[in-house]
Regions:
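Beta-barrel outer-membrane channel/assembly domains of diderm bacteria
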Residues: 21-167, 364, 412-418, 426-459
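Repeated loop/turn-to-beta-strand initiation elements of outer-membrane beta-barrel proteins
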Residues: 52, 105-108, 160-164, 199-203, ...
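Residues on the lipid-exposed face of transmembrane beta-strands in outer-membrane beta-barrel proteins
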Residues: 54, 93-99, 152-156, 190-194, ...
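Transmembrane beta-strand segments that form the barrel wall of outer-membrane beta-barrel proteins
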Residues: 58, 163-177, 202-204, 238, ...
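Outer membrane beta-barrel
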Residues: 98-131, 138-219, 240-247, 319-330
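Outer-membrane beta-barrel translocator/channel fold
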Residues: 203-226, 235, 277-357, 437-443
Length: 459
């Protein structure tokens, strides 16, 4: 029987290998060469290439706290009143004007975007204190309608290299806008993006303020997870993205959050096989974070990585992801950014001190069944071994965490309109459950979200 089982297992492995190698993704080496085209050389003019576009997003979230978790609101005066329910409903609209680049060796362009938010649910108890979902006054009342200049920048371009100055959207592993609310965040500063080579790009930037998702003003940078109120005046970053093979992409970035930490990031994604038969995608993300400067957050020495495998057969994708934090503090990143390019960053980030986590997820793409744009997904993730008892600092409230654990599961569906006047309109519904042990920071709750984003073109 043992020989039969061994033979069957060997046959299964051989069959799987054959399927993966059927019509495989090219593994060919990609030599680095200067780009054959110049983006600036194709510029048509400031007004000739101008665009006026926008989106309007209806963002609804309904949370129910469970176990020992609760929200609070000000029923009267300054005394907080606990409640188990939190509801936020906001309409966020963006109108974005982008000019074309002027012609010549050096081209110039500008971008201006007006952000507007309307609180559709203004009940003080429903909002349960506001936070980063609905903008509120100091007394807890909703700000019914507010606007701000979300983007305002000028660009200068030579060939395929662009320098941007002003308020802008940035998306890198060490500083990235976060767009999971009615409106996204943005940053004030300078950024350089160079695509002079066919398989090698370079980015660098320096930013001194963030425009939060649910605030009208600009603020300094602060930590996402520190319990102290410390601010950083600047984030500097640089990085490269390199594609040495047709099937392999790599990234390396470094950043300095002034007087907080130095952070280094490395990643690769490798593609194998053919998704019509069986494709395999492997993704590694690694962050190294070390305290720096005045060490406003105290000692930090953190190594965090995630490794994920996604097998895809036509409409079906199955993902297995492992993530681990090696450090006595959280894996941390700047507040109002999405600089956590890790596989198990879900409703919870699964980034507690010394935490290990495992996720399994499934996605069904209905395009294979004649309904392009429709997708379903389901996942479950578990984190364990959270231990902050050896933490030597005071910035992170982790010393009571000793063997903490938690789990999360979610289901979701999304649909994106493929053509017609509502092309690119997207609707997404998700239901997520999170349960935590006593001192795990995220608590226990259920959340339902319904987000509808309608895109429109004016000019």
């Amino acid at each position: 029987m043992k020989k039969v089982n061994t033979a069957a297992f060997a046959l299964s492995i051989a069959t799987l290998s054959a399927m993966v190698q059927a019509e495989p993704t090219s593994q060919a080496f990609v030599p680095t060469e200067l780009s054959s085209k110049s983006a600036q050389g194709e510029a048509n003019g400031f007004f000739e290439d101008q665009h006026l576009t926008g989106t309007t997003r209806n963002w609804y979230a309904n949370e129910l706290a469970r176990r020992d978790t609760s929200f609070s609101y000000r029923k009267g005066g300054d005394t907080p009143t606990p409640t188990s329910r939190r509801i936020n409903w906001v309409q966020g609209t963006i109108v974005d004007y982008t000019s074309g680049f002027t012609q010549g060796t050096v081209g110039f362009s500008t971008e201006l975007a007006l952000y507007n938010a309307i609180a559709l649910d203004r009940d003080r108890k429903d909002m349960a204190g506001g936070s980063n979902r609905t903008l509120t006054e100091n007394d807890g009342d909703a700000v019914g309608q507010w606007s701000k200049m979300g983007l305002a920048n000028v660009k200068a371009r030579i060939s395929n290299t662009t320098l941007t100055g002003g308020r802008q959207s940035v998306n890198t592993p060490v500083i990235a806008y976060i767009g999971n609310r009615a409106l996204p965040s943005s940053f004030n500063g300078f950024a350089l993006k160079s695509d002079e080579f066919n398989n090698l790009s370079f980015q660098a930037g320096s930013f001194d303020r963030v425009s939060p998702r649910t605030e009208q003003s600009l603020t300094k940078f602060r930590s996402e997870y520190a319990s102290t109120t410390a601010f950083a005046d600047r984030i500097d970053m640089a990085g490269v993205d390199y594609k040495p093979f047709e099937s392999l992409t790599t990234s390396f970035y470094a950043s300095n959050v002034e007087d907080f930490w130095h952070q280094y990031y490395f990643a690769f994604t490798h593609e194998l096989g053919d998704t019509d038969v069986l494709g395999l995608s492997t993704n590694l993300n690694y962050y190294k974070t070390k305290d720096a400067g005045q060490r406003k957050l105290g000692p930090i020495d953190n190594d965090t990585y995630s490794l994920s495998f996604t097998a895809t057969h036509q409409a079906h994708s199955l993902t297995l992801a492992y993530q681990e934090v090696e450090g006595d503090e959280y894996f941390d990143y700047a507040h109002e950014t999405n600089a956590i390019f890790l596989a198990n960053s879900l409703l919870s980030d699964f980034n507690g001190p010394n935490e290990k986590s495992l996720q399994i997820g499934y996605v069904l793409n209905m395009a294979e069944y004649g309904v392009p744009g429709l997708k379903f997904n389901v996942y479950q993730a578990r984190g364990w071994g959270i231990d902050g008892t050896h933490y030597k600092g005071t910035a992170y409230d982790v010393k009571s965490m000793d063997g903490e654990s938690h789990y999360e599961y979610g289901v979701g569906t999304s649909y994106t309109v493929q053509d017609g006047p509502l092309k690119a309109t997207a609707v997404r519904a998700t239901y997520t459950t999170h349960r935590a042990s006593e001192f795990q920071a995220d608590g226990s709750l259920n959340e339902f979200r319904l987000v509808t984003t309608i895109a429109f073109n004016i000019l």
